[in-house]
């Protein structure tokens, strides 16, 4: 019975907090939340916004996968992806934030806006450990860049 009340509170609130090893928290809001026990996942649907101390994520759906210790392992953002980082906006069709590898992979119609510059490609890999970003084209279209003066 206590479990039913807990799930009901989570559904009504549609907010999730998770403490990571580095003491950062994720705050997530959406129109709807579905929690699955085995494997432990949270699916946020509709007008989804998620943030931690550094990143802001927007999308139609966000899937949160947890490890065996109930720590967030992967965050997948699906459709109308927007990621806001310090002085940078990233757009795409899908993004995967791997908290263990500390990278973000954005795919499908990737657009990056930073300091007036605009980059377009099919895939972006952001390495948060080494502070590097790699944008790739595909066989039909190369990477394009518009540099601001």
Predicted regions and their residues:
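Mature-chain termini and adjacent capping regions
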Residues: 1-149
């Amino acid at each position: 019975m206590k479990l039913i009340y807990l799930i009901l509170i989570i559904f009504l609130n549609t907010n999730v907090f998770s403490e990571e090893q580095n003491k950062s928290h994720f705050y997530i809001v959406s129109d709807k939340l579905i929690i699955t026990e085995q494997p432990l996942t949270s699916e946020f649907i509709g007008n989804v916004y998620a943030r931690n101390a550094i990143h802001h994520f927007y999308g139609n759906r966000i899937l949160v996968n947890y490890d065996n210790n109930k720590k967030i392992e992967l965050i997948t953002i699906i459709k109308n992806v927007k990621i806001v980082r310090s002085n940078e906006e990233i757009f795409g069709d899908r993004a995967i934030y791997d908290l263990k590898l500390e990278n973000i992979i954005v795919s499908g119609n990737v657009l990056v806006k930073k300091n007036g510059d605009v980059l377009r490609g099919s895939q972006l890999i952001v390495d948060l450990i080494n502070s590097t970003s790699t944008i790739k084209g595909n066989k039909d279209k190369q990477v394009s860049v518009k540099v601001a003066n």
